[in-house]
Amino acid sequence: MKILILLLSLLSAPAFALDPINREAHIAATLIAGRVGDTIRNTCPTISARMFVVYGKLKELERYARAKGYSEADFTAFRNDATEKNRMKAEAAAYLHGAGAVEGDVESYCRVGRDEIAKGSLIGELLRSSQ
């Protein structure tokens, strides 16, 4: 009888629906930071990625997503979705522009990268400067 009552109470409880993964602020912000770092390292010849750190941060983010209730498939699909990639690229470009990066001016990207490294921001943690 107790099991039946427990089962009925569980079945009647409302299910907690997750927000779409693209609305999870920490996940989106972290992936955008990664996109900013990637753009900087691909533009500035004196800045490179700290690949072990990048990999570690990605795994940390995957664990965070799982703890929030998202599946590995949800996370992978979000990361690989073309629409989301374009949205994140646009947000990364806007961030870079706001930070002083100017398209066609390589040194401006290097300067933003060095500033991020000096600040110790998430973007800066993903990068290393050879200067």
Range-by-range predicted roles:
Residues A17-V53:
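Immediate post-signal-peptide N-terminus of mature secreted/exported proteins
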Residues G56-Q131:
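Compact alpha-helical subdomains of small soluble proteins
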Residues M1-L7:
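Sec-dependent signal peptide recognition
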Residues I3, A25-L31, P45, K57-E60, ...:
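Short, functional N-terminal and low-complexity linear motifs
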Residues S12-P14:
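N-terminal signal peptide c-region/cleavage motif recognized by signal peptidases
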